[in-house]
């Protein structure tokens, strides 16, 4: 782990940052010799980075692998060994010059195919999206049509036109019942007398009425203090005897006159 971190640090500093600054100086001073040198270095280093991806996967278990890699980077960069220029002149330049035409043809084909593949994938994506939208629309229409067909004419006629049931407040049931009652004497045929009011109401709406009680006059304060004395019932026999007696008394008065 330590060797891997040291190796990455060496490659970053001595393999990238220092050559980048040296290339900047060569471009600024317009020194052709230095310019060619660092161009050869960057070509070799690019090939090294491409090969490093494969070697890190398959050969990283090899002992002293990271140490060898650090030594190789320093050998490429060193002005004494000139490893980058040596590898470029001996191996890279001859192989590239040999296969230059083939590489150019592959690059052109890759550009054309990449453009065509992008267009084909775009068309396929649009076609898939359009087909999915059409299928979803047809499925929804088919489901709606199936539901409508399931209803027969009898089912449609059986649907009542009655309004939806309203909410009944338990605190104001009497007011709601009075609003629901039809007017007095109302029937399907027209208005009738008030005597037939009970017959007009249905069984559910008919409410039994309590017998009306006569209103008693409120007692005055003076009357409430009085004691009502009731006369004892008079018998019939006594009333007749009194009448007879009165008649007997009236007779002698006439004779004297």
Curated annotation (Swiss-Prot):
One of its GO terms (cellular component) is cytoplasmic microtubule. The modification Phosphoserine is found at residues 152, 194, 202, 253. It is found in: Endoplasmic reticulum membrane. The modification Phosphothreonine is found at residues 196, 250. Expressed in circumvallate papillae and testis. The chain crosses the membrane at residues 1-21, 42-62. InterPro entries: TB2_DP1_HVA22 (IPR004345). Residues 183-257 are annotated as: Disordered. The keyword Transcription regulation does not apply. One of its GO terms (molecular function) is microtubule binding. GO terms for biological process: cell division; endoplasmic reticulum tubular network organization; mitotic nuclear membrane reassembly; nuclear envelope organization. It is a multi-pass membrane protein. Keywords: Cell cycle, Cell division, Endoplasmic reticulum, Membrane, Microtubule, Mitosis, Phosphoprotein, Transmembrane, Transmembrane helix. Microtubule-binding protein required to ensure proper cell division and nuclear envelope reassembly by sequestering the endoplasmic reticulum away from chromosomes during mitosis. Probably acts by clearing the endoplasmic reticulum membrane from metaphase chromosomes. Belongs to the DP1 family. This is Receptor expression-enhancing protein 4. It comes from Homo sapiens (Human).
